[in-house]
Regions:
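Conserved AMP-binding/adenylation subdomain of ANL enzymes
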Residues: 209-230, 238-279, 293-294
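AMP-binding/adenylate-forming catalytic domain of the ANL superfamily
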Residues: 508-532
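Conserved ATP/PPi-binding loop(s) of AMP-dependent carboxylate-activating enzymes
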Residues: 363-367, 378-410, 449-451
Length: 542
């Protein structure tokens, strides 16, 4: 395999996502990734990315082709993601447990040329016809003992996957052209909807690199300890927070991303006790899990310096409990809330250890502009509440194949400044801190995932026996969930069978957080004075 001599020698692609890491690998030879006790250097990372890129090139993947990755945070996922980026193709990263039907719709929508799935999930997706399917696996990066037992332990799940491993593809004999355009589309991330029918956000390399460029600003004088430090990278890459902050930002700052395929409290505990972790990024429900366990209540947490939380509303008690445990164990680490959205890749506003305010989500990055507007688009003054708008170098290019939604969400003002209308309500105080009051959009979040009630309702209304329905969000601070109310189309229907049928259908079509925890069949859906379903009354019925 070979690469364009001009680009490889001159590092002309250094401003691309992979170009940043390739450049660093020539300067730093420390640990880039950790996974299940094994460490992988920047040199190993570069070598594997080059090999994966060669295999993809041999499969016919070229600039602007779409490659879908449906796999958890394992080393081969990272190699594949960077390899796709290096040759100028587009990464479309989705939930590793996405239902086959929803995935096939997404592949058609994006015109994907290749699908990469976890080898344990091959049998679930093997009948998809939209594009060729290859598998990626943690096997090659496991310890010798785990490597030996892997095909035995997962024999039933690996059935049929033999011969489809991406690493079995020969290297190309053609020279590979490296991408040098940081402004072209390079990543597709779903906007967080509950099915494959939600919007797909189009991002470029300039946007995905942006968070890593601001790590020094976020950490302040503590940045001098960043090189060689570990960041817990278990938030999945289909989430902008996981992609840009959990994986990419550490690597662009000479640090280490500690990968996890799934949340593993025992493994996190080992990393903390070995004093290999310095930074944590979490979403609220995972922070609660960590606080309930024994992972954080150990003197070794004194090595932690920063913990960042976002992607969902956080109960204030989470901050006080976390900070109390840190103080008890002589750690200066504090839980710091930030704010962003997929349309900005991830966080663009954050509290810092030395500049924070309780209840706020912090201040904007240096090149980020914030404003709050009223219903007529007028800019509001300090402490006045309205819709939050963001202008930043990391704004998405728009929504895939949806000009109407793009034009509605991304607007350019009279000064030529481009803004994203977040749909969130809040205000900026006199010190420049942003406070979030709630969501204007008709959606809610559970475990960091955007849940659209309309998706749930549209799907339910198509099920036999359902006349009408309404999905409501029950904001339980310890365990938020969806409650679905159904009006059947017959008085003689077996309600228990109807509930069972609805649950089975939704479980097959929706991500698990969107599947209603409660399903209630009622005689009549309450209506407002204008004839709309009164969801406030339904919440009261929960």
């Amino acid at each position: 395999m070979s690469f364009s001599n001009k680009e490889e020698k001159g590092m002309a692609f250094e401003n691309t996502v992979w170009g940043r890491i390739a450049l660093i690998s020539t300067r730093h030879h420390g640990v880039a990734l950790r996974f299940r006790g094994k460490e992988f250097s920047y040199d190993y990372l570069k070598d594997q990315v080059d090999k994966y890129a060669s295999r993809l090139y041999n499969l016919g993947i070229r600039k602007d082709d779409v490659v879908c990755i449906a796999a958890p945070n394992i080393p081969s996922s990272i190699f594949a993601m960077y390899a796709v980026n290096s040759i100028g193709a587009i990464n479309f990263i989705v939930h590793p447990l996405i239902p086959a039907k929803a995935l096939e719709e997404d592949l058609k929508k994006t015109k994907a040329k290749l699908l990469l799935v976890l080898d344990q999930r091959y049998s679930i997706y093997k009948d998809i016809k939209q594009c060729p399917i290859y598998t990626i696996s943690p096997k090659n990066e496991l310890s010798p003992i785990e490597d030996f037992f892997y095909p035995i332990a997962y024999a039933s799940k690996l059935k049929g996957s033999k011969g489809h491993d991406l690493t079995s593809v020969p290297f190309t004999k053609e020279p590979i052209e490296r991408n040098t355009d940081e402004y072209k589309p390079s990543f597709y991330l779903q906007s967080g909807g509950t099915t494959g029918k939600n919007k797909i956000v189009v991002l470029n390399d300039r946007a995905v690199n942006y968070q890593g460029e601001n790590v020094a600003w976020i950490l302040g004088d503590q940045y001098r300890y960043c090189k060689g430090s570990g960041m817990l990278g278990f938030l999945p890459m289909f989430h902008g927070f996981g992609l840009a902050m959990g994986v990419h930002a550490p690597l662009t700052n000479y640090a280490t991303s500690d990968l996890m395929a799934t949340y593993n409290e025992k493994e996190i505990g080992k990393l903390i006790k070995a004093r290999k972790l310095r930074y944590l990024i979490v979403v609220p429900y995972l922070a609660k899990r960590m606080l309930k366990g024994k992972t954080l209540n150990d003197p070794s947490v004194s090595n932690l310096t920063h913990a960042f939380i976002g992607a969902d509303k956080t109960n204030p008690t989470v901050f006080t409990e976390f900070d109390s445990i840190m103080e008890k164990n002589n750690s200066k680490c504090r839980l710091l809330e930030g704010y962003g959205l997929t349309e900005t890749v991830t966080v663009v506003v954050v509290n810092r250890i030395f500049d924070r305010k309780p209840g706020s989500v912090g201040k904007p990055f240096p090149d980020v502009k914030l404003k709050v507007i009223d219903e007529n688009g007028n800019t509001l003054s300090t402490n006045q509440s309205g819709q939050i708008c963001i202008s930043a170098p990391c704004l998405a290019l728009g929504y895939l194949n949806d000009k109407e939604a793009t034009d509605k969400t991304f607007v350019t003002d009279e000064n030529g400044i481009r803004w994203v209308l977040t749909g969130d309500e809040g205000y900026i105080d006199e010190d420049g801190f942003l406070f979030i009051k709630g969501r204007i959009k008709d959606m809610f979040k559970i475990a960091g995932f955007n849940i659209f009630p309309a998706d749930i309702e549209d799907m339910t209304n198509k099920i036999e026996g359902v006349e009408n329905c309404a999905a409501v969000y029950i904001e339980n601070p310890n365990h938020p969930y969806v409650h679905l109310f159904i009006k059947s189309d017959s008085k003689n229907i077996d309600t228990s069978e109807l509930v069972k049928r609805v649950r089975e259908n939704l479980s097959n079509e929706l991500i698990k957080y969107a599947v209603p925890e409660k399903i209630t069949v009622i005689d009549k859906l309450p209506l407002t004075n204008v004839g709309k379903i009164d969801k406030k009354k339904l919440i009261e019925l929960d």
